[in-house]
Amino acid sequence: MSSNMPASLANGRYQLGQLVGRGGMAEVRVALDTRLGRTVAIKIMRADLANDKIFLSRFRREAHSVAQMNNPNIVNIYDSGEETVMTDSGGTERLPYLVMEFVKGQTLRDVIKANGPLSQRDAEQVMLGVLNALEYSHHMGIV
């Protein structure tokens, strides 16, 4: 990720907060949407991948696809954009981002780490949510 991560995106609309997750393609930060006064999650693509047309296309396709969905088991996408930041060497980097619903809570990994294996009933509830989202995604032509 850029060593020059801005404090905000979209001309100050989204004030970036703490890092909440990192994956192979992007990192996710909690942020404040100053226009609507709500907490959001912002997925920011790794700067080194933003110039790769395949990764950038995949990132944009994800935003468009998920924005069309309306399911309680799939996070909502509110906005997307791209920021240009200065690098330490004086160049610029592109930072494409997605603004998403912030879902407060723990990851399944953290729950299992803290409490041990799920009971059969809890595992079934988790799987029902996942399967519901998968079925809906399939119905929408995503998978």
Task: Give each language-model segment a name.
Residues 16-23, 28:
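Protein kinase glycine-rich loop
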Residues 21, 61, 69-73:
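Flexible N-lobe loop architecture of eukaryotic-like protein kinase catalytic domains
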Residues 30-39:
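Conserved N-lobe loop of protein kinases adjacent to the ATP-binding glycine-rich P-loop
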Residues 46-68:
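AlphaC helix of the eukaryotic protein kinase fold
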Residues 80-81:
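Activation-segment/catalytic-loop signature of the eukaryotic protein kinase fold
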Residues 86-107, 111:
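Conserved short submotifs of the Hanks-type protein kinase catalytic core
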Residues 126-127:
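Activation segment signature within eukaryotic-like protein kinase domains
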Residues 130-142:
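Protein kinase catalytic-loop region centered on the HRD/HxD motif
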